[in-house]
Amino acid sequence: MTKKLHIKTWGCQMNEYDSSKMADLLASTHGYQLTTIPEEADLLLLNTCSIREKAQEKVFSLLGQWKLLKEKNPQLIIGVGGCVASQEGEQLRQRAPCVDVIFGPQTLHRLPEMINHVQGTNSPVVDISFPEIEKFDRLPEPRAEGPTAFVSIMEGCNKYCTFCVVPYTRGEEVSRPSDDILFEIAQLAAQGVREVNLLGQNVNAYRGATYDGDICSFAELLRLVAAIDGIDRIRFTTSHPIEFTDDIIDVYRDTPELVSFLHLPVQSGSDRILTMMKRAHTALEYKAIIRKLRQARPDIQISSDFIVGFPGETQQDFEQTMKLVADIHFDTSYSFIYSPRPGTPAADLPDNVSEEEKKQRLHILQQRISQQAMEISRKMVGTVQRVLVEGTSRKNVMELAGRTENNRVVNFEGSPDMIGKFVDVEIVNVYASSLRGILLRTEDQMDLRTHESPQSVIARTRKENEIGVGIYQP
């Protein structure tokens, strides 16, 4: 009888990536098949996030529901991973004894052994250590699920912003070897992936070892990824302003595969608040980065993160944030009311901003950025946009949906054979969360690179010397 696995994922794209790797790993080692129905599962995994307010309460609320399932099925195994698990550790089991496995973001690759331990000894196991980059050596080969894919290139953070738990839950920055990343992306490209999104808590802090013992910078990695046959779009998230060096900006100047869209968190427009957050840059320095980016790529759109109501934030501080929003003309944002995270320095600061004031400031900020996003969308009407077709439209299965470079969903009429390919569409209408397009040309009518598999490249370029040793000759 097939064993079923249910994974509930909260949080960032890194968590989504980790959950997909857990599913692949447990399918290869234990034959688990994914199910969306918790009641069907033999193994329940919760991949948690501790960034937002009341993260712990949310976890224990769901575990209370899963406890009832375990009472009906004592053989059910319950595991909790992610950042809350890393924070809480053994204390998590004290509040929720139904949990059998507790693992951190850096130990998910040990899940098969942990499950075997629980099944063999009927006793719980906790592993929230930070074994550097070991997990990537233990995960199965990547499996494409559509024309886009996420690839983790580094983990952790060394910045220790005063509001953030990431350095404490995911550890300090560790970069994967560049060859491992390129091989994973080449495997995905051979399966039809056209767009890759490089992931990391501070992705532009990437410093990965090369095969010859040198160090590959993030800018160098971007160019190497762009050279992989079949990869026509590159995104990355999340980056930090102090790591956004000029060599990365140069890649925007000469590498068209890198999209004209960047998510670069700033958190506040007030230098005083930025100092209290330990962001290590000023608003002016942030604006200088954007100015240089727009010189290199005039059509680039910028999104960001904002925290409103940080302890001590005055009305003047907030107005400086709003000025930055207007000056940069941000496209979109992830903006939240500040909530203290246990164990962070900011949690000890006196919170003298009223809840009403926080809510009002958040509303003003979000309204302004929504207006700016709509302005940008309306300016796209009448333009021709290259769209990567991801599948059928959510609202009408008879239509297709894809994304523009600046991350907007476009719905249009087309045929199923276009899925996974690029098309050019004219934007004819704008809606709250999507655009309407008319198909102009298909990928076959474009001057794109011809897709060629790694195997065919080797077959075409392999030569042998006089003693029969294979030589690569480009």
Swiss-Prot record:
UniProt-listed InterPro entries: Elp3/MiaA/NifB-like_rSAM, Methylthiotransferase, Methylthiotransferase_CS, Methylthiotransferase_N, Methylthiotransferase_N_sf, MiaB_methiolase, rSAM, rSAM_horseshoe
Gene3D superfamilies: Methylthiotransferase, N-terminal domain, tm_1862 like domain
All copies of domain MTTase N-terminal, residue ranges: 3-120
Reaction equations catalysed: N(6)-dimethylallyladenosine(37) in tRNA + (sulfur carrier)-SH + AH2 + 2 S-adenosyl-L-methionine = 2-methylsulfanyl-N(6)-dimethylallyladenosine(37) in tRNA + (sulfur carrier)-H + 5'-deoxyadenosine + L-methionine + A + S-adenosyl-L-homocysteine + 2 H(+)
Residues holding [4Fe-4S] cluster 1: 12, 49, 83
Segments forming domain Radical SAM core: 143-375
EC number: 2.8.4.3
Subcellular localization(s) per the UniProt record: Cytoplasm
Cofactor note: Binds 2 [4Fe-4S] clusters. One cluster is coordinated with 3 cysteines and an exchangeable S-adenosyl-L-methionine.
Keywords: 4Fe-4S, Cytoplasm, Iron, Iron-sulfur, Metal-binding, S-adenosyl-L-methionine, Transferase, tRNA processing
Cofactor entry: [4Fe-4S] cluster
Span of domain TRAM: 378-441
Main location: cytoplasm
Superkingdom assignment: Bacteria
GO cellular component: cytosol
CDD domains given in the database record: Radical_SAM (cd01335)
Record GO terms (molecular function): 4 iron, 4 sulfur cluster binding; metal ion binding; N6-isopentenyladenosine methylthiotransferase activity
Binding-site residues for [4Fe-4S] cluster 2, renumbered to this chain: 157, 161, 164
Entry keyword tRNA processing: yes
Assembly and oligomerization: Monomer.
Stated family: Belongs to the methylthiotransferase family. MiaB subfamily.
UniProt cross-references to PANTHER family, sorted A to Z: CDK5 REGULATORY SUBUNIT-ASSOCIATED PROTEIN 1, MITOCHONDRIAL TRNA METHYLTHIOTRANSFERASE CDK5RAP1
Primary role: Catalyzes the methylthiolation of N6-(dimethylallyl)adenosine (i(6)A), leading to the formation of 2-methylthio-N6-(dimethylallyl)adenosine (ms(2)i(6)A) at position 37 in tRNAs that read codons beginning with uridine.
Record's protein name: tRNA-2-methylthio-N(6)-dimethylallyladenosine synthase
Species classification: Bacteria, Pseudomonadati, Pseudomonadota, Gammaproteobacteria, Enterobacterales
Gene name of the encoded protein: miaB
